[in-house]
Curated annotation (Swiss-Prot):
Protein name: UDP-N-acetylglucosamine 1-carboxyvinyltransferase
Gene that this sequence comes from: murA
Organism for this UniProt entry: Vibrio vulnificus (strain YJ016)
InterPro entries (alphabetical): Enolpyruvate_Tfrase_dom, Enolpyruvate_Tfrase_sf, MurA_subfamily, RNA3'P_cycl/enolpyr_Trfase_a/b, UDP_GlcNAc_COvinyl_MurA
Biological processes per GO annotation: cell division; cell wall organization; peptidoglycan biosynthetic process; regulation of cell shape; UDP-N-acetylgalactosamine biosynthetic process
Domain of life according to the entry: Bacteria
Known role: Cell wall formation. Adds enolpyruvyl to UDP-N-acetylglucosamine.
Length: 421
């Protein structure tokens, strides 16, 4: 199993980094390509394990898939309608295959998905939405099976709770439904907006993405097209926090400030100098004092839960005491005990973590527990005294494109190695 060896330093992280395309947009876009009857080209797709798994799944379904810079998908040859357990057991996003399959082919089945173990993320909302569009759903032998005679039917759907995943499932399926679908209490994340842009490029008629009401006028077919995936706002935020906690200055390119306004506001509150341009963001912490901030995670445009672990680390290194409240997922403070192994001061009380400040962390052997928490451990290792070993880094590879290379280019000392038995 691969690990990171991180040599800590008091030297600030300095330099420039190019941000990859958003995993959370690239995945639904690749799954949405199932809806098309002609070839599609998707640019700015990150090099990640989940992307590779998705491309392999599309091939298993019969699509022609190749990557040469962009990802090219020809879904016209799809003739299988099952996403099998051996492929999807590690990836929760696989549920996104179900809506496009039943919408285009009248049938589909997906093995109940895996992914990060950060609380209950049930597929109930996906299933309910597809049922409201007219699909018959059954759970058999660990598979979610969907079927419809003829086309799905447009409907007025009010979501019980805001869900990014279910919003994408319903929006994708409704593109080929007969009639108009109105989706209320929809999630508003930029990745949903990007998925809608992709579908509209293929001929869909979607309006309102980015608001809490999305309207989809069903069309009979989708054609081909080209699309570039939006920047990864979480990767952007991760590198900006790395600059802040190390007392450095980092410029992130190929990203946009409007994607993470809540994060930038908190970085400014923490004492950082934040500057932005059309396609870049910089954080300068040189000679400035890091101050703790209070954070409450919330659906977009609120503070993203995927930045919570990074700001937990920031609060541990900042002056004063900061309180972080997690409202999206339970069981998402698994990074806190690992950071405490490095000397951090923090107490978990229900869905909040209260951080005290420490002068400097000490190296330790720590274990990555989920995708975003893993990044906070790597950054902690960069600023700790001594040599930190981060175990189970396959979590990181699921969401960050060459994170060690990008951090090393800023002055970090991170080595990927495989421990021999």
């Amino acid at each position: 199993m691969e690990k990171f060896r991180v040599i800590g330093s008091t030297q600030p992280l300095m330099g420039e980094v190019t941000i990859s395309g958003a995993k959370n947009a690239a995945l639904p876009i690749l799954f949405a390509s199932i809806l098309a009857e002609e070839p599609v080209e998707v640019a700015n797709v990150p090099h990640l394990r989940d992307i590779d798994t998705t491309m392999e799944l599309l091939k298993r379904l019969g699509a022609k898939v190749e990557r040469n810079g962009s990802v090219h998908v020809d879904p016209s040859s799809i003739d299988e309608y099952c996403a099998p357990y051996d492929l999807v057991k590690t990836m929760r996003a696989s549920i996104w295959a179900l809506g496009p399959l039943v919408a285009r082919f009248g049938q589909g089945q997906v093995s109940l998905p895996g992914g990060c173990a950060i609380g209950a993320r049930p597929v109930d909302l996906h299933i309910t939405g597809l049922e409201q569009l007219g699909a018959t759903i059954t759970l058999e032998d660990g598979y979610v099976k969907a079927h419809v005679d003829g086309r799905l039917q447009g409907a007025h759907i009010v979501m019980d709770k805001v869900s990014v995943g279910a919003t994408i499932t319903i929006m994708c399926a409704a593109t080929l439904a007969e009639g108009t679908t109105v989706l209320d209490n929809a999630a508003r994340e930029p990745e949903i907006v990007d998925t809608a842009k992709f579908l509209n490029t293929l001929g869909a008629k979607i309006s309102g993405a980015g608001t809490d009401t999305i309207t989809i006028e069903g069309v009979e077919r989708l054609g081909g097209g080209k699309h570039a995936v939006v920047a990864d706002r979480i990767e952007t935020g991760t590198f900006l926090v790395a600059a802040a906690v190390s007392g450095g200055k980092v410029v992130c390119h190929n990203t946009q400030a409007h994607l993470l306004e809540a994060v930038l506001a908190k970085l400014e509150e923490a004492g950082a100098l934040v500057e932005t341009g059309e396609d870049w963001i910089s954080v300068d912490m040189t000679g400035r004092e890091l101050k703790a901030v209070n954070i409450r995670t919330a659906p977009h445009p609120g503070f993203p839960t995927d930045m919570q672990a990074q700001f937990t680390l920031l609060n541990m290194m900042a002056k004063g005491g900061g309180v972080i409240t997690e409202t999206i997922f339970e069981n998402r403070f698994m990074h806190v005990p690992e950071l405490k192994r490095m000397g951090a001061k923090a107490e978990i009380e229900g869905n909040t973590v209260i951080c005290g400040d420490v002068e400097r962390l000490s190296a330790a052997q720590v274990m990555a527990t989920d995708l975003r928490a893993s990044a906070s451990l790597v950054i902690a290792g960069c600023i700790a005294k001594g040599e930190t070993i981060v175990d189970r880094i396959y979590h990181i590879d699921r969401g960050y494109d060459k994170i060690e290379n990008k951090l090393n280019a800023l002055g970090a000392k991170i080595e990927r190695f495989r421990e021999s038995n």
